[in-house]
Amino acid sequence: MGKKGKKEKKGRGAEKTAAKMEKKVSKRSRKEEEDLEALIAHFQTLDAKKTQVTETPCPPPSPRLNASLSAHPEKDELILFGGEYFNGQKTFMYNELYIYSIRKDTWTKVDIPGPPPRRCAHQAVVVPQGGGQLWVFGGEFASPDGEQFYHYKDLWVLHLATKTWEQIRSTGGPSGRSGHRMVAWKRQLILFGGFHESARDYIYYSDVYTFSLDTFQWSKLSPSGAGPTPRSGCLMAVTPQGSIAIYGGYSKQRVKKDVDKGTQHSDMFLLKPAEGGEGKWAWTRINPSGVKPTARSGFSVAVAPNHQILVFGGVCDEEEEESLEGSFFSDLYIYDAAKSRWFAAQLKGPKSEKKKRRRGKAEDPEGTTEQETGGSSAPEPLEVIKEVVSEDGTVVTIKQVLTPSGLGVQPSPKADDSASEASSTGQEPCPRSNAMLAVKHGLLYVYGGMFEAGDRQVTLSDLYCLDLHKMEEWKTLVEMDPKSQEWLEESDSEEDSSSDEESEDGEDKDQEDSAEEGADPQHPEVARGEQFEEYLSRTEQHWLKLARSHVGPEAKEKKVLKVAQAMAKSCFDDAVQDIAQARH
């Protein structure tokens, strides 16, 4: 009895500490949230201009991570919502809704009036009732400089049959958070964990909430037993036995002033309905057999039709006093919930007959050249210099290098064939974290995510597919060359250093401008089907930087903005014209 009493007392003490920390974080973050609420309201004003549902065929979505990818419960479609992208200087937040048709291999952008505000690191769960519903809770909005965060505590449902968003207003729900996990269990949503962060403080959660899909009411659970410590980004999935599995995740704690230590968890728990009445649950810690994933965070999770739980990718951070380096993964682990066993997925590779056939088709006779086989050599990039006049009459000169793709040059039939073959020769996703996963008809889809190359963050927009029945090879559905991604931080530092050196040497402004023009004349390309507003939003920092270099450091921001928009519009119009000419 004495021991039990001590444990209960200790548990209540931990709850009080967590409550104090939450109050402290909430108070300090309120000012930040007020600032961000104004920015969120601005974006919502733009969204309010949408008065009807529009469905527009489009290219694959732009690079992003921490979005949600969900399989439609009735149609052969995947639903992509939200996410974020960082280009080295600015963080972009999204609330776009895309539909990927599995049968047609096409993307459609769906604009619906009254959508949820822009967010990432939310949770989305699909349920079959009413022709299919996508339930979205929480997530975060980051300021453009990535220094401030607003954590949502709102609940939304997308009615897939009617394509309408609805905000569900119900009291007693979880506090604002991101990185939490949520699953559908019978006719309930069950939510666990997550974190809330301000500029100076943070708190991780281990609480559990349920939301009834019948009464639309939140309830906070108080499971018996020792459960997981507070964490975010964990595995959460329903097992065949009706329990809820929790594995891994990430948390951090302050070890001294301005020094935090992160923990990559590798423990596993089951949350089970307990005997003794409805609404009673119990935690049980388990130790499955087999080979579980190595220590990591940022992994992605999906559930296969046979209740096998899939874990893909992630990153293992190695922390030192003032540095953080990560090793990224592209491996796939499977947890067999029926046998309580982990194992690493092994791909068999394509059948030997297919290999031979591909090899015979792809290889050229020894010694042949592209001209001998009927191919055409790639055209040289074309440099174009033009003057642009902004609204206020400012005249600037921009230099643009048009690459073969920018000129609308089509690859030769041979190149098409080889690209088609490459998409099915087992090219696997590169190592990454925070990717989006979904399973439909026994096929695993992996979209986007990110990895780091030195100080640079590369955000991905590729899409891969793996047949979980055959387990032979990955198929590439959308390709991406990470080297083609714009990164502004590196070029800025180089220009700043060169500018400082030139100032010290006493060189004049004209020499400085010409040096900058010659350093990076190539501008961001326009994607097929992209509207100017989308192009400007994606590339705005590039044009602002270029405009500032032309009008000088003393120019007002309004003037710089006008010049930047004029330069972007000129480049956009030229690209659209080139694409149109290439079609004829």
Curated annotation (Swiss-Prot):
Residues 1-33, 50-69, 348-381, 405-433, 482-533 are annotated as: Disordered. Kelch repeats lie at residues 77-129, 133-187, 188-238, 243-289, 308-361, 443-494. Residues 1-10 have a biased composition (Basic residues). InterPro entries: Kelch-typ_b-propeller, Kelch_domain_protein. Residues 487-519 have a biased composition (Acidic residues). The keyword Repeat applies. Coiled coil: none annotated. Residues 11-24, 520-533 have a biased composition (Basic and acidic residues). Keywords: Kelch repeat, Phosphoprotein, Repeat. The modification Phosphoserine is found at S418. Signal peptide: none annotated. This is Kelch domain-containing protein 4. It comes from Mus musculus (Mouse). The gene is Klhdc4.
